[in-house]
Amino acid sequence: MAANTSSEIKIENALYAVHCTPDTGIFQILSKAGNLAFIQEGKWTLAKATASVVSINHPVYGAGKSILLTGQESTASITLFDSSPFVFFGGNSLNTTAQEMIINEYAPHQLSIQINEPVSAIRVLGTAGLKKPEENPGSYTFLAVGSVEHRNGIVAGWLTQDRGNGVIFSERKEDAVLLRPQIDYGRLVIPAKSEAKHETLVVGYFDDVRDGLEKYADHIAAHYAITLPRIPSGYCTWYSNPHGGANDEKHLPELAAFVQKTLKPFGLDFIQIDDQWQGRSRDRGELDRRGRTDDYLGKPKDEQNKKWWWGPHADFTQHDPEGPYPSGMTSAAQNLSTLGFIPGLWLMPFAWDPLCDTLIDHQDYFLKRADGGLYYAKWAGWCLDITNPAAHEFLQKSIQRITKEWGFNYLKLDGLWNGTGANLLYVNDGYVKDDLGEAVAYDRTKTPIERYREGLKLVRLAAGTDVFILGCNVSQNMRTLGGSFGLLDAMRIGPDNGPDMNSLKAGPWHGSNRYFLHGRVWYNDPDPVYLRASMPLEHSLLLCSWVALSGQLTVMSDWLPDLPEERLDIAKRILPNHGLKARPVDLFEHDLPQVWILTDTQSGVRRDVLGFYNWDEKQDTTITYTAEKLGLPDAPRYAAFDFWEKKSLGVFEKELSVSLPKGSCRVIAVRPLLDHPFVLSTNRHITQGIVDITSENWDSAANTLSGSSKIVEGDPYELRIIVPAGWSADTIKSETPDCSAAMTQTDTELRAVLRSPTSAEVRWDITFKRT
């Protein structure tokens, strides 16, 4: 199509039609399904542009068409791909001058959104939580606009964040929601007579916003070619009481031996040593400045605390010889490996101490201020400048030492935001303006996000693909959310939690808010579960049930040898991780969702498990939803079973109503009622068959229910089977040697118990007869 500036240009695919007027930079996007102009009006910041339509073929998204707009100082594009449910927005900035150009932030356009709902019935979901559009302070990376009642709406998200950090702002404008996407670069350098490509934004309309969020995450995974390893479950030493922090070389073997016997058979496979193992540097009593001034070291101008430099020791090249592991970290890792565990270690790859013996003569390894002093970020400390080739080599060798020489195959990387050279904003959820770009790097052509991503790539290169890498944590500064895409196996998606009710909700809130990233972009880490006897049992069940059902990283951090048997059994019922993708039911109804659903069909039948959570520790509640709203398959009647109460809830029809005492939960397996016997639940795992049943079959000719189950040695395995009226159990057998089988039927419920002296996949058969 020939270039023009005035006439309307149109592109379309099966889902959308885009109309654009180049002369004004105004465009409109319609969803064909309901003939809805969900972007009523979009407006590029460039005007008087020439335009053309081109056909493209993308290596990831395939065939498509783009509207290309070209102005004097920038270009813009709107693209539709045949295979994608999103509209893609891109652009370039042009530097036509003879001097370099610096861009700190870039706001390409604004979008007026309408989803056929009054604005009063709409909420936006972003990193700041569930808000009215006008109350959103700005969301990092993504923002969803949805109907509270109907779930329809739009999802907008930055697909790429390779050089800049994506933010989306919202406001209410009469009967519409106005979105303003923005990229914060900090400092993007465009050389003379050159141009810079900006990040890519995607926007799409969906009947269920959850579908859109999940597909957005799928697009990120496709763009960055993300392939996740198997999700592990494990133990972190930090919160344990006693023996917290890094634990020590006397008590860690005691813990590991106990876990090997009690929880490893159920699926606990890593043990990670946390902070306080490392070489001494910053002394928490008094800082040895070694001839440097506070000003050189970066003391903040407004800081009144005499211990402004307080934070973790930050020399990760060696252990503290007077610390918890005097025999060294190689010995610690070997002791864990010998017992069959993946050894894990905490460190801060981008935060190091310039005053430690290792680095005192290498001040050039650190980011600087404009006046030549060191740039300091509160708590984590001084920032390694990865653009300096010598610092680059130093970090590479440090990671290789930890993984290849010491033998740690699980890394927990704390203080990640130091890699961007920006403020600590903890706890950071909604957008906060920071000092991104003010720190001075060796290579000033690299943006802060670019430096950060290169640092993470270096860690992966040095560690190898067989090392599991967990980032920690986005709440220190949310620049690390999108900046980490494609470079980590897991990410702490919130701040530190704790065993008290207010603190334990931190993981579920952040893990719900960002649920769609889990299992697609990385594994969400909500911080550990707690089982300690000092904690109310119902609160332990509440947190454990949420983590286990949501499928997010399951980590324990109590002194497990002291757990009462009842609480140790809870740990067994949440291991291993099911490895699937659950979703919240009420994502746009409650800031902290109260209902989750997990669905699986791997065993040949569909299994649905619902989690109901009362996060209020002062008030009882009742939650009622229709089967359709819950996401259950269409059926006239359903059978339900309460896992923790170990009892059948009978049959319900169109809706399920659940009563919850304050600060409690219920985990309920649901299946459509059939005209023959079927397995509704098991006692092995909170998912009630999803983790353990590998097959289930009904033979109508032989009146036989058969299947295979993964059984743990010495753990009585119970099948909870619904037996419709007119049937009774006749015989039961196990085809696995040494595995005993027994059963008891009461009315319409059968309990079949299998016992195996070894962990094995057991084949079982139960015959029935008509009564």
Residue ranges of each PLM-predicted region?
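C-terminal beta-strand-rich structural cap/linker in extracellular carbohydrate-active enzymes
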Residues: 652-690, 746-771
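Glycan-recognition surfaces
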Residues: 359-393, 397, 446-565, 589
